[in-house]
Design a protein with these regions (language model features):
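Short beta-strand->alpha-helix junction loop in the catalytic core
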Residues: 197, 244, 380
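Conserved S-adenosyl-L-methionine
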Residues: 13-14, 232-243
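Hydrophobic, well-ordered beta-alpha structural blocks that scaffold small-molecule cofactor pockets
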Residues: 247-380
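Acceptor-substrate binding/catalytic loop of class I
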Residues: 27-35, 206-221
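Conserved SAM-binding loop
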Residues: 87-205, 217-235, 250, 303, ...
């Protein structure tokens, strides 16, 4: 086994990792590289981790979006509509009902799933999304779309409410993005969004949340700091009802004096030392059991497998039935489902997800796997 990662005092690099951007029916290649390096560093002033792509990697990310095959969790192809999607939409509906905005925009609206949901409850939303994918769905479903990239000039001072889902973690220079949203709101306007909660991963030195498209990994403190720095007040950061997410609300109220001195910092401080320990421990696990082990939750296991150069030597499992038999670009085996699990004597599983760890562990035990054969980030 060759170590395929480097950790410095202020950065972490995986030399090559599957560039997840679609689920395919075969291992066929695309015009986009299937594996690319990934590097992260810490923005300590805002207490979050930031992916630092090269120009080549940014081009690959842009091409992935343009090819219309990128799957967001609130798009029809994802299989997450009735779980994750339902949780997020209930949050957005609650905010819209509370503030009754006259002019509402969704940044990164994709197929318009949330727009359609709010429309069914009597609220009009204008989508903002530059993709051909979104344009096709706006024509199909009949919602209004600004088919362009969002910036501070696009809807300057016009919005009563702006919301987005699974966007905040994808945006480079998210501090500038937050300021652009602030400038786009009317006085008293509201910004709400759902984004990934990486607090636990950062605290443990865990890399399971790494994806090339997730350019930011946030703690609760980092959300407060970014929004307060942009000018927002009345900031609320709460856990979502499904998965490991933040549900965030903030308001544009210039008359309010913002106090951020009391926010506890340094969650990211020491992350790279902790990550070094986790990756070293995973390498030891892989040498002992990993070659024959199975891995549960593909997107969360792939970063670890990439650190040991495993791009298709092990079976990946997921509970989402719509993923069964599909391939992730850069990984040579199809994803298996619960129905494929069979107990094998002396077999083992590695659970990549912390969010659904306990649920998955119970499932594996029910299939006959003894607790001592089930491993995870917690046991490294």
């Amino acid at each position: 086994m060759t170590q395929r990662w480097n950790v410095q005092q202020d950065s972490l690099e995986i030399l090559e990792m599957p560039f997840y951007w679609r689920l395919s029916n075969s291992v066929g290649t695309s015009k986009i590289p299937v594996r690319l390096p990934i590097r992260i560093t810490a923005r300590l002033e805002y207490d979050y981790l930031e992916f630092r792509p090269t120009d080549v990697e940014w081009q690959a990310i842009n091409n992935a979006y343009q090819q219309n095959a990128n799957i967001g969790f609130l798009n029809p192809e994802s299989g997450q509509i009735n779980t994750y999607g339902s949780s997020v939409n209930r949050f957005f509906l609650e905010v819209v009902e509370t503030y009754a905005p006259e002019k509402t925009f969704e940044i990164g609206c994709g197929a318009g799933f949330s727009i359609q949901f709010l429309r069914a409850h009597g609220f009009k939303v204008i989508g903002i999304d530059p993709s051909e994918y979104s344009l096709e769905w706006s024509k199909r479903l009949g919602f209004e779309l600004i088919n362009d990239f969002f910036d501070e000039h696009l809807i300057y001072g016009k919005a009563d409410l702006i919301f987005c889902n699974d966007v905040f973690e994808h945006v480079p220079q998210v501090d500038q993005f937050s300021k652009a949203v602030y400038k786009s709101l009317k006085q008293g306007g509201v910004f709400c969004f759902s984004t990934t909660n990486s607090t636990q991963s950062i605290a443990l030195g865990d890399i399971s949340m790494l994806e090339h498209q997730h350019v930011n990994m946030f703690t609760e403190a980092s959300i407060y700091l970014l929004l307060a720095n942009a000018g927002f007040s009345d900031i609320s950061v709460k856990s979502g009802s499904y998965g490991n997410t933040f549900h965030v609300i903030a308001r544009k109220k210039d008359s309010v004096i913002r106090k951020i001195e009391s926010i506890k910092l340094a969650s990211c401080k020491g992350f790279f030392e902790r990550a070094y320990q986790k990756l070293t421990a995973f390498g030891d696990f892989y040498q002992k059991l990993g070659y024959s082990s199975h891995y549960y939750v593909p997107l969360r296991c792939i970063p670890y497998l990439a650190t040991v150069g495993n791009f298709g030597d092990s079976d990946l499992y997921d509970s989402n039935m719509s993923w069964q038999g599909k391939y992730i670009d850069g990984y040579a085996r199809p994803i298996k489902s619960l129905s494929d699990i069979e107990y094998v004597a002396n077999g083992s599983f590695f659970i990549g997800s912390m969010t659904f760890h306990d649920e998955i562990k119970r499932t594996l035990i029910a299939h006959g796997y003894p607790e001592k054969s089930i491993h995870s980030v917690y046991t490294l």
